[in-house]
């Protein structure tokens, strides 16, 4: 769920990379101020992108300051100035980590779940106080997603023959069924990111006139990004989920078919993000936003595809 929304550093100018890194460090320091030092280990690219994206519509911003880091206290580098928007991006993504911990707990992954629940319980409580309607939307979407996943897993286990054979042996009907299942499941994740983007936009000091015009674009992008992350996570975990009998939206497909479908679905969301990001009136950092969407996402998709192909090659050799 986290760690997929990355820049592609070789295509960034030095000043743009310095800016991105300053925001990444600011998010990390914000986590430390709000929740203590250990949660800083969870600093994510997703929180950094959320802060970067909405700060790009703000004309004025305090200058970055040279600061040392707990990981490298002897060397100072630019860190973006503290900002309520950075704090909110840190808070909301930390609360989502808590939600992921609850999901892992339901899956029986105690070793992963308990540290997340312990470290980010405060974040979940703080977000509920600050944005109760957002939390209600997130919790409803995640609850419905878990219910859908349990239902689909039960159905699949009830027809093991269909789920154990590649779709090419059963015709295209199963492939289409899996596509619909994957898109339905991803839509819940899309609802989460749409709600997050919408709430963050309201806090981003975008003028009322602009906010009214841009809110629809933000929500479309949030939906597409949430769905892309869901597909990325599903592709990344497909082999582990199959081995442990857990739900995966691509279950029932052969490895080759799974990869083809995942790439197709992810490309479609990348196209949506690219088309709508191009419509936005940035004051700054447009090149970094474009780098993430047009370079970072496709290359992360390619990395996941290469991982799947490597597993498939190993499986064939065995």
Q: For each of these PLM feature ranges, what is it?
A:
Residues 227, 275:
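Surface-exposed charge patches
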Residues 1-189, 197-220, 231-267, 278-285, ...:
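Acidic catalytic motifs of isoprenoid enzymes
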Residues 221-226:
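Membrane-embedded alpha-helical segments that form the functional core of polytopic membrane enzymes
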């Amino acid at each position: 769920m986290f760690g997929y929304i990355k820049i592609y550093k070789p295509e960034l100018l030095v000043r743009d990379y310095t800016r991105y890194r300053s925001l990444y460090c600011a998010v990390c320091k914000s986590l430390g101020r709000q929740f203590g030092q250990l949660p800083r280990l969870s600093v994510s690219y997703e929180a950094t992108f959320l802060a970067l994206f909405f700060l790009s519509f703000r004309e004025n911003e305090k200058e970055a300051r040279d600061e040392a880091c707990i990981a490298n206290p002897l060397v100072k580098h630019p860190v973006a100035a503290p900002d309520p928007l950075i704090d909110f991006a840190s808070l909301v993504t930390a609360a989502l980590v808590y939600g992921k911990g609850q999901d892992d707990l339901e899956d029986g992954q105690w070793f992963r779940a308990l540290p997340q629940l312990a470290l980010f319980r405060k974040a979940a409580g703080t977000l509920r106080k600050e944005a109760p309607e957002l939390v209600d939307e997130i919790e409803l979407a995640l609850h419905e997603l878990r219910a859908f996943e349990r239902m689909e897993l039960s159905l699949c286990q009830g027809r093991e023959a269909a789920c154990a054979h590649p779709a090419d042996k059963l015709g295209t009907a199963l492939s289409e069924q899996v596509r619909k299942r994957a898109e339905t499941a991803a839509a819940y994740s899309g609802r989460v990111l749409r709600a997050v983007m919408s709430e963050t936009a309201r806090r981003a000091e975008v003028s009322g006139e602009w906010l009214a015009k841009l809110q629809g674009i933000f929500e479309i992008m949030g939906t597409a990004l949430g769905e892309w992350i869901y597909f990325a996570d599903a592709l990344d975990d497909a082999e582990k989920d199959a081995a442990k009998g857990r739900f995966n939206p691509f279950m029932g497909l052969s490895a080759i078919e799974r990869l083809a479908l995942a790439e197709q679905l992810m490309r479609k969301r990348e196209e949506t993000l690219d088309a709508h990001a191009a419509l936005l009136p940035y004051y700054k950092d447009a090149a970094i936003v474009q780098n993430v969407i047009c370079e970072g996402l496709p290359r992360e998709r390619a990395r996941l595809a290469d991982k799947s192909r490597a597993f498939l090659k190993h499986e064939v050799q065995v």
